[in-house]
């Protein structure tokens, strides 16, 4: 798992971006959050752990959890 910080997240739209420890930005969609976070969403500045899914539009954060 990678570590990073939530750069921005719009709960009303269900997506945002995480900046990884490697300074790369990863798109995150509500579908990539662990179940307990789907209702709550994410907040800018939160430290998170995540896996990366390589997609046609770029890398995407999945299995996102706090910590």
Please name every model-derived segment.
Residues 3, 49-51:
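Beta-strand secondary-structure signal
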Residues 25-38:
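Beta-strand/loop nucleic-acid-binding surfaces
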Residues 1-12:
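Structural detector for short beta-strands of small beta-barrel domains
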Residues 53-67:
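OB-fold/S1-family single-stranded nucleic acid-binding modules
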Residues 36-49:
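Short nucleic-acid-contacting surface segments enriched for D/E, G, S/T with interspersed K/R
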Residues 10, 21, 54-56:
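A generic beta-sheet turn/junction motif
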Residues 13-18:
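Short aromatic-glycine-enriched beta-strand elements
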């Amino acid at each position: 798992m990678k570590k990073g910080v939530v750069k921005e997240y719009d709960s009303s739209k269900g997506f945002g971006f995480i900046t990884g420890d490697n300074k790369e930005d990863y798109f995150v969609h509500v579908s990539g959050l662990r179940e307990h976070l789907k209702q709550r969403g994410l907040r800018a500045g939160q430290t998170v752990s995540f896996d990366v899914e390589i997609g046609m539009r770029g890398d995407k954060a999945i299995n996102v959890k706090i910590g």
